[in-house]
């Protein structure tokens, strides 16, 4: 299974999404693509911080459509993911390359479940051993 990072999900919500990302998504079987609860939190927090208005309403509508699409494919943050997250954060800090909690949680979910991560931010995850990365923004 491939988990789409928040930057990939937000690309799907854009007025004019990157055609390379759309082409990549079309090559992935729907049953093989999912999102995780951390992305749900990040997107909903971002939407909640936008000023009320037309733009926010449009994005919220697109988000609802995506949530409906992924409703049965949202990967949760569980005990194994939390344990992987702790190990990832320790390794990153020890190596002098601290990472955000959200990124570490996404990586922990992926690593504990054996999932690949589709992200634009390859460098943010490059030091996480045992994590397969895909950049859907590159041809």
Identify what each model region corresponds to.
Residues 1-39, 47-65, 139:
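Short, well-structured N-terminal submotif of metal-dependent ribonuclease cores
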Residues 5, 36, 98-100, 121:
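Histidine- and aromatic-rich ligand-binding microenvironments
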Residues 8, 39, 81, 106, ...:
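Alpha-helix capping/helix-boundary segments
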Residues 9-10, 41-44, 126, 134:
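Nucleotide phosphate-binding site architecture
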Residues 28, 70, 128-129:
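Short, structured coil segments at secondary-structure junctions
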Residues 45-53, 72-118:
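Active-site neighborhoods of divalent-metal-dependent phosphate/nucleic-acid chemistry enzymes
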Residues 107, 111-139:
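Acidic, PIN/NYN-like endoribonuclease modules and their adjacent C-terminal/linker elements
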């Amino acid at each position: 299974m491939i988990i789409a990072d928040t930057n990939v999900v937000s690309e799907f919500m854009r007025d004019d999404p990157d055609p390379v990302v759309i082409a990549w998504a079309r090559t992935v079987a729907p049953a093989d693509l999912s999102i995780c609860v951390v992305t749900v939190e990040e997107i909903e927090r971002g939407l909640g911080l936008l000023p009320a208005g037309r733009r926010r309403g449009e994005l919220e509508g697109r988000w609802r459509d995506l949530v409906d699409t992924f409703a049965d494919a949202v990967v949760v943050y569980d005990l194994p993911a939390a344990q992987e997250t702790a190990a990832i954060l320790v390794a990153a800090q020890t190596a002098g390359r601290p990472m955000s909690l959200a990124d570490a949680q996404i990586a922990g979910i992926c690593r504990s479940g054996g999932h690949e991560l589709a992200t634009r931010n390859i460098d943010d995850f490059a030091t996480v051993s045992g994590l397969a990365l895909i950049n859907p923004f590159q041809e």
